[in-house]
Curated annotation (Swiss-Prot):
InterPro entries: Ca/CaM-dep_prot_kinase-assoc, Kinase-like_dom_sf, NTF2-like_dom_sf, Prot_kinase_dom, Protein_kinase_ATP_BS, Ser/Thr_kinase_AS. CaM-kinase II (CAMK2) is a prominent kinase in the central nervous system. Residues 14-272 form the Protein kinase domain. The keyword Coiled coil does not apply. PROSITE patterns: PROTEIN_KINASE_ATP, PROTEIN_KINASE_DOM, PROTEIN_KINASE_ST. This is Calcium/calmodulin-dependent protein kinase type II delta chain. Autophosphorylation of CAMK2 plays an important role in the regulation of the kinase activity. GO terms for cellular component: cytoplasm; neuron projection; postsynaptic density. It catalyses: L-seryl-[protein] + ATP = O-phospho-L-seryl-[protein] + ADP + H(+); L-threonyl-[protein] + ATP = O-phospho-L-threonyl-[protein] + ADP + H(+). GO terms for molecular function: ATP binding; calcium/calmodulin-dependent protein kinase activity; calmodulin binding; protein serine kinase activity.
Amino acid sequence: MASTATCTRFTDEYQLFEELGKGAFSVVRRCMKITTGQEYAAKIINTKKLSARDHQKLEREARICRLLKHPNIVRLHDSISEEGFHYLVFDLVTGGELFEDIVAREYYSEADASHCIQQILESVNHCHLNGIVHRDLKPENLLLASKSKGAAVKLADFGLAIEVQGEQQAWFGFAGTPGYLSPEVLRKDPYGKPVDMWACGVILYILLVGYPPFWDEDQHRLYQQIKAGAYDFPSPEWDTVTPEAKDLINKMLTINPAKRITASEALKHPWICQRSTVASMMHRQETVDCLKKFNARRKLKGAILTTMLATRNFSAAKSLLKKPDGVKESTESSNTTIEDEDVKARKQEIIKVTEQLIEAINNGDFEAYTKICDPGLTSFEPEALGNLVEGMDFHRFYFENALSKSNKPIHTIILNPHVHLVGDDAACIAYIRLTQYMDGTGMPKTMQSEETRVWHRRDGKWQNVHFHRSGSPTVPINA
């Protein structure tokens, strides 16, 4: 008879110690593998509290972390599911945040900044070669392996990371951290690997002067700055920065993602690969002083958010391999990871694609209609007299014989749209459709129908797989 015993491998093999960080559904604790004495950081997720979508995200994070093996990336050593909990066993990184270490140094130069960004670029390049986009590159996720001098920079927190095919650009949702978001994400355009390079540009700018290129307490104004690429190199602090460093920043902060420098190209830039002869060795005390203020502002706003989170269930709050004070920040700062806005943006996306589909119908554009619909589209509609219709032939008849031949103006609006998101790649929308048209006598008329549409995303594109319409037929009968 098959054993139904619950897995207790983590409990059997590891000993837990103090807490290192905390999120809404997870806690990070130091642990030790009993057989070897080797220390790790265990991210312990309470799976009883996770939604189906959160489960998918956890599986994605574990899958991505298992794939990435690089000296500049926090390594996942084990992933164990037990009753009610999932354990992700990572490298124990004890050096804290890179930015906190820099301000404690007695000497810090452009050459040091070059060495830091080189390690970050190595980690990003490894991600991109493996089809992974991090999406949340920022100081909080740049850690040091140990307190030793010259310890490696480690990229952490793959909670928002996504898997992409080659140079695929698609809309993967609104996610990231405000001050580090790329113009294409803010425009809600398809995006891919270049978003990480934009964030690298923001990080490099801060590494050189201690403050960010884009900053405003008002998030809308901040986003306008980013979309316009409105940054500069003000005097006097930038006067002592070499032209090569500024050139690399300009190549990273290029608005057009197709023209933005890639990680592999950036690693070949003279300021990186010829550091000893190109980057300045002058100590940058002003940068260290500014960076102290920048860090203090991040920590203060983090403390405010922690207080806010204590009073509500906030699933986006998460902590991975952070120092106890490495907390997230309030939404008006530029350092808060945002993914809840992703839900709002995705719902808006479903409304937009539904409007595009209706526009194709109004225009009698069967080609545009077929691009938005799944070839096996199923439907219940008044024209089919209660029968389930499958495929496109039934609809083709109306496009060829009624819709395309109607040259009278038709105007449609969607009222009270309600969108239900079903996981990452499916959604359902219900709405009332009002269609205005001119009848045969030149009189304005209005038709109303109630519609529900089911959408499925394949290869980054939404397709209508089913709809149910009651009320008036689509085509004005006496038009």
